[in-house]
């Protein structure tokens, strides 16, 4: 069972939630000690594994019929096997967020509450955002909320609104990009998403456009951030130019996102060390 939970948690994507915590901590901290403060350690630990078990566990429970025809589940990802023990562990991982949030500054609570609601209702009824075009993309701003919570948890203040907006737009683009390989299985199952509504080519153009907008918003925070985010629309251009299948390119993005996140984090750490 534990091996199955490990696979269910998508270890390849762990840093999609835990990585933003590092970014948020690096910009929220003002001293080296704050980088290793209790809020920083607790949030990173939660979003590294329990949050991933909850997010993807909920997804797999309510997508089990769709996943029967999803080719991604034949290799690096697993199909939901059911079982009471697995369901209980997934639920506990979600409820545990309340214990994580309790000792944190109140400024962090709205971001954690929003993350829980979006992580749940993205896949679960009654809202099931993932089956409504535009809302499926918009709700995936949940991936930037760990960064906002970490910033607030360490600093006791809210993060810059433009930084949250830029990150939200980036997450929207990532969601639709990752949904392009699922277009045919989703259509076969009668699921409507931004990607199925647009089709592969227009969905790819949508990703490029929203990533350009993300870069523009980040540039208002710091021009260097905007330049860094231009990597994403440039990659889309390369994918189209070289006619690389999105289903293949999809598996590059954990490395791409880790690299971009590392640069963001190093910038924050530079500010902590050098003022």
Curated annotation (Swiss-Prot):
GO cellular component labels: plasma membrane
BP GO annotations: carotenoid biosynthetic process
GO molecular function: transferase activity, transferring alkyl or aryl (other than methyl) groups
EC nos: 2.5.1.150
Name this protein carries in UniProt: Lycopene elongase/hydratase
Bilayer disposition of the protein: Multi-pass membrane protein
Subcellular compartments: Cell membrane
Assigned keywords, A-Z: Carotenoid biosynthesis, Cell membrane, Membrane, Transferase, Transmembrane, Transmembrane helix
Enzyme class: transferase
Primary localization: membrane
Entry similarity comment: Belongs to the UbiA prenyltransferase family.
Disruption phenotype: Loss of bacterioruberins production.
UniProt keyword annotation of Transferase present: yes
The reaction(s) this protein catalyses: all-trans-lycopene + dimethylallyl diphosphate + H2O = dihydroisopentenyldehydrorhodopin + diphosphate; isopentenyldehydrorhodopin + dimethylallyl diphosphate + H2O = dihydrobisanhydrobacterioruberin + diphosphate
Functional pathway: Carotenoid biosynthesis
UniProt function note: Involved in the biosynthesis of the acyclic C50 carotenoid bacterioruberin (BR). The enzyme acts at both ends of the substrate, and catalyzes the conversion of lycopene to the C(45) intermediate dihydroisopentenyldehydrorhodopin (DH-IDR) and the conversion of isopentenyldehydrorhodopin (IDR) to the C(50) carotenoid dihydrobisanhydrobacterioruberin (DH-BABR).
One Pfam match: UbiA
UniProt xrefs under InterPro entries: Prenyltransferase_related (IPR050475), UbiA_prenyltransferase (IPR000537), UbiA_sf (IPR044878)
Phylogenetic placement of the source organism: Archaea, Methanobacteriati, Methanobacteriota, Stenosarchaea group, Halobacteria
Domain of life: Archaea
Known regulation of activity: Inhibited by bacterioopsin.
Transmembrane segments: 13-33, 38-58, 84-104, 107-127, 134-154, 160-180, 203-223, 225-245, 253-273
